[in-house]
Every structure is written in C-alpha cells, then in structure tokens.
Amino acid sequence: MKYYIIAGEASGDLHGSNLMKAILAKDPTAEIRFWGGDLMQNVGGTLVKHYRELAFMGFAEVIMNLRTILGNISVCKKDILSFQPDTIIYIDYPGFNMRIAKWAKKLGIQNQYY
C-alpha cells in the first residue's frame, strides 16, 4: 500500500515517526512518502519537505510568506498526483492539511486525520 503523510510541525514529526513504525511493522512493503522531519526520516520512506521549511507562526509571518505557503500547497498537490497514494494521512497542521484534504477528497483519494 502507498501512504502519503503530511506533518508540518515538530510534534507531528514525533507522531508521524511512531505511526510509520507501526505501518511498516504491519506492512513491511509499504511505500511511504512524507512531509515531516528528522524523526520520520530516520524511520524510512521518502522525505519531500522538512517541516522547518513549512513553519510560519503568527499573522505577520504568514502574510509575509503567503507566496511560499501557496507554493508549498501546489508542490504537495503535484507530488501527490505523481505518487498516487492509496491514502493520505494528515497529522495536525490544519491550515495546510485541510486544503489538501478537501482537494484530495474531490479526486477520490482516501483521507485520514491522525
């Protein structure tokens, strides 16, 4: 099975790494592609973007980086289309993840919020 996991924060990286370990224990042939951090990368799979590139806090910082944020959404959608996962698992990071989930649902891709 092919899994696409999106964790945009350090806490999501921790939860994502534990989830990936559990997935791989049950399905050693699982293909995992993810947005996360070092902990998830240490488990395996393919890191697309590190959460350090995604973390913008506060209203002003979000506004100043709006072009980057929208660009990341576009990169994510293109990567999902290329990878063609069986399911996408979202870990926190609601501002980004809910946009991707709404789009993916229209395409018939299974969505899971962790």
Give, region by region, the residue ranges found by the protein language model.
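Active-site and donor-binding regions of nucleotide-sugar-utilizing enzymes
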Residues: 4-114
